[in-house]
């Protein structure tokens, strides 16, 4: 099974994938995020954040209030299953999480918490 995915977040405010499938035979799953664009993170920063679909809006709202210096994430937010740091042009970050944190049948969303980005930069994550 493929237990990782490479995701790009660009200057057009888009991820290059909006559906991720995690094979339940994977013990851990890794997301490798890169930013191929030209804009710095204070203008067009991207992160990759995972929560349940039900928790997504709260994570985004509280993240915006937390500000750029906190990567637009509420510190130690228990609703966040996994997240990368916020990156800008030419930067990369990865996150690995335990697949045991996911439940079959639950709806998960991955998204960017930079203000205004989650409307476009979001997708599903499914355990199969």
UniProtKB/Swiss-Prot annotation:
Disulfide bonds join 3-26. SUPFAM superfamilies: Cupredoxins (SSF49503). Gene3D superfamilies: Cupredoxins - blue copper proteins. InterPro entries: Azurin (IPR014068), BlueCu_1 (IPR000923), Cu-binding_ET (IPR050845), Cupredoxin (IPR008972). GO terms for cellular component: periplasmic space. Residues 1-128 form the Plastocyanin-like domain. Cu cation binds at residues 46, 112, 117, 121. Transmembrane segments: none annotated. It is found in: Periplasm. Transfers electrons from cytochrome c551 to cytochrome oxidase. This is Azurin. The lineage of its organism: Bacteria, Pseudomonadati, Pseudomonadota, Gammaproteobacteria, Pseudomonadales.
């Amino acid at each position: 099974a493929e237990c990782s995915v490479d995701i790009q977040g660009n200057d057009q405010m888009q991820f290059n994938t909006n559906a991720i499938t995690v094979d339940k035979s994977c013990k851990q799953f890794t997301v490798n995020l890169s930013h191929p664009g030209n804009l710095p993170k204070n203008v067009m920063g991207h992160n990759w954040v995972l929560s349940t679909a039900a928790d997504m809006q709260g994570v985004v709202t509280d993240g915006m209030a937390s500000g750029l210096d906190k990567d637009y994430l509420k510190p130690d937010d228990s609703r966040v299953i996994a997240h990368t740091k916020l990156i800008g042009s030419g930067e990369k970050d990865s996150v690995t999480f335990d697949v045991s944190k996911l439940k079959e049948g639950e709806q998960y969303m991955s998204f960017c918490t930079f203000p205004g980005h989650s409307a476009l930069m979001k997708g599903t994550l499914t355990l199969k």
